């Protein structure tokens, strides 16, 4: 165990640098705003800065922990499950995995508290069942080679038809649910399951099908919440703003965070327990991994646990109040339009601080053998999220229905999926679920809510939907990246024979060329 801990220290330093690069730009933007056009109280600023420090350390531990534990656990379980060749077992265990992982997702608890007229447990169980069913569907798609675009066309058509019957106060929250439930606990494990299942297949489309699980699992919650919205006819919507902190000294500042820590210690322990138990059953029955591998996974789980506790405490206690108050101040100015470019700038950098984004970018680079680098993937995600936050701020200021953005956006995304390589489509729809994580829920959503309060808008119809917008735009930007890469490849292939012929002639002696 000591050797494993020592071996992980250089990696921790590497992850710390990555975390600093991700979070410091957001801190810099907020500080510039605070000292220029958007003054905030010292209490909120101090909470934000301490929260940022906790988020940096949290990302450092989580990203290394996910590499050491969540990814290998998911891959081995996915591979072992597929090796059984038992369809009933794959369906049963697949549903159970999806159900348990979703119930344990911390962000789902936040969503449940925000949805009016539906009991929390009813919503949580319904969403978990939706993810479980669609995880099974994702497994079956991979095993039988069903094209992902066909399923996406079918289910998003059903979603938009159901949207016509859902009260407008409920619509944005329903679409937000798809992004929120694929959070930092769900994504690394589900993506690793996909890689494990695809590893058994030896055909040329196996790599293409190793992605797409998160895409389909994001559909389940949207359908579940839309159906619940119709059944419960939810129309009584109330908004409870976050409590703005007031501290007089450093002891009171630490007291705020210390009070939040036990909540997240408990939440993350509850989140990890079902996954650990399922892996324990697999280990006893089939995997039989050696002690060193189990030790590495155990250390990784400890890092994951510490990382998520620190990250969520920093995000909820430090970032959420700052985002809300900043939104109110910016939208309260006579030049409130500035909220749009500032939102785009924050959106560009904030996706880099999403814990699960690191897992996605790394797996994309590995599965594509470097054809899609982690850096290129990060740029595509940042561009997409920047655009989506800008559009979300337009909605806040104008009150335009979210459907005016979602229907054209998804129509275009699904249309280009018919001409883009399958791998890029699967990665793009996975990226949508990954990009809309806890940073979106704890900073961008409060930013929109605060701005909505300042302009006198409807919180439920105008501010909610930020998560849905963030989940939509990467579908377009990542696929466009894939389309450009494909066009470049085709151009290179066409040019290759001419270059090869010229090279062949160049190698011949002059008299040989004359004889030809």
Q: What are the residue ranges of the model-derived segments?
A:
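Intrinsically disordered, low-complexity non-transmembrane regions of multi-pass membrane transporters
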Residues: 1-19, 23, 74-88, 202-213, ...
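Juxtamembrane and boundary regions of transmembrane helices in multi-pass small-molecule transporters
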Residues: 2-3, 138-153, 168-169, 173, ...
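Interfacial loop-to-helix junctions that mark the boundaries of transmembrane helices
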Residues: 13-19, 40-50, 82, 115-124, ...
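Alpha-helical transmembrane segments and their helix-start/interface "positive-inside/aromatic belt" motifs
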Residues: 14-22, 46-52, 80-88, 148-153, ...
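Hydrophobic core segments of alpha-helical transmembrane domains in multi-pass membrane transport
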Residues: 24-37, 51-61, 93-100, 130-141, ...
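Transmembrane helix-loop junctions in multi-pass membrane proteins
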Residues: 32-46, 66-74, 100-115, 134-146, ...
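Helix-loop-helix junctions within the multi-pass membrane cores of secondary transporters/permeases
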Residues: 78-80, 87-158, 336-417
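Transmembrane helical segments that form the transport core of multi-pass membrane transport proteins
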Residues: 243-356
């Amino acid at each position: 165990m000591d050797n494993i801990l020592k071996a992980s220290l250089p990696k921790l330093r590497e992850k710390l640098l990555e975390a600093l690069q991700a979070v410091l730009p957001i801190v810099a933007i907020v500080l510039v705003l605070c000292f220029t056009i958007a003054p905030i109280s010292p209490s909120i600023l101090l909470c934000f800065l301490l929260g940022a420090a906790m988020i940096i350390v949290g990302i450092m531990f989580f990203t290394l922990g996910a590499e050491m534990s969540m990814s290998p656990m998911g891959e081995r379980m996915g591979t072992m499950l597929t090796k059984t060749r038992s369809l009933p077992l794959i369906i049963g265990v697949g549903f159970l995995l999806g159900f348990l992982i979703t119930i344990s997702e911390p962000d789902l608890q936040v969503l449940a508290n925000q949805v009016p007229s539906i009991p929390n447990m009813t919503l949580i169980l319904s969403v978990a069942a939706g993810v479980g069913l669609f995880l099974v569907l994702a497994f079956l798609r991979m095993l039988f080679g069903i094209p992902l675009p066909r399923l996406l066309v079918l289910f998003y058509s059903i979603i938009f038809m159901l949207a016509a019957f859902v009260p407008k106060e409920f619509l944005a929250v329903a679409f937000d649910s798809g992004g929120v439930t694929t959070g930092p606990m769900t994504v690394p494990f589900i993506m690793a399951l996909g890689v494990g299942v695809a590893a058994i297949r030896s055909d040329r489309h196996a790599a293409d099908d190793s992605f797409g699980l998160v895409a389909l699992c994001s559909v389940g919650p949207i359908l579940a919440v839309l159906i619940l919205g119709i059944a419960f006819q939810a129309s009584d919507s109330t908004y409870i703003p976050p409590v703005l902190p007031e501290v007089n000294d450093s002891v009171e500042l630490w007291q705020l965070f210390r009070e939040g820590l036990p909540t997240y210690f408990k939440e993350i322990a509850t989140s990890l327990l079902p996954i650990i138990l399922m892996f324990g059953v697999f280990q006893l029955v089939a995997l039989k991994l050696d002690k060193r591998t189990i030790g590495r996974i155990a250390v990784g789980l400890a890092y994951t646990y510490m990382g998520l506790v620190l990250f969520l405490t920093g995000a909820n206690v430090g970032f959420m109040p700052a985002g809300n108050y900043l939104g109110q101040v910016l939208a309260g100015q006579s030049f409130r339009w500035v909220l749009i470019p500032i939102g785009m700038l924050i959106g560009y950098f904030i996706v880099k601080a999403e814990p699960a984004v690191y897992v996605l970018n790394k797996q994309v680079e590995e599965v594509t053998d470097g054809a899609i680098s982690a850096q290129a993937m990060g740029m595509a995600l940042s561009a997409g999220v920047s655009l989506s936050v800008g559009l979300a701020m337009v909605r806040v200021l104008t009150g335009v229905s979210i459907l005016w953005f979602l229907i054209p956006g998804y129509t275009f995304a699904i249309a280009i999926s018919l001409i883009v390589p399958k791998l890029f489509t699967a990665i793009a729809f996975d990226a949508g679920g990954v990009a809309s994580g806890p940073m979106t829920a704890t900073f961008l959503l409060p930013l929109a809510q605060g701005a909505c309060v300042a302009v006198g808008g409807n919180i439920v119809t105008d501010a909610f939907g930020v998560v849905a917008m963030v989940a939509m735009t990467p579908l377009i930007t990542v696929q466009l990246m894939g389309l450009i890469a494909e066009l470049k490849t085709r151009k290179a292939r066409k040019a290759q024979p001419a270059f090869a012929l010229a090279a062949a002639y160049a190698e011949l002696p002059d008299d040989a060329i004359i004889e030809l």
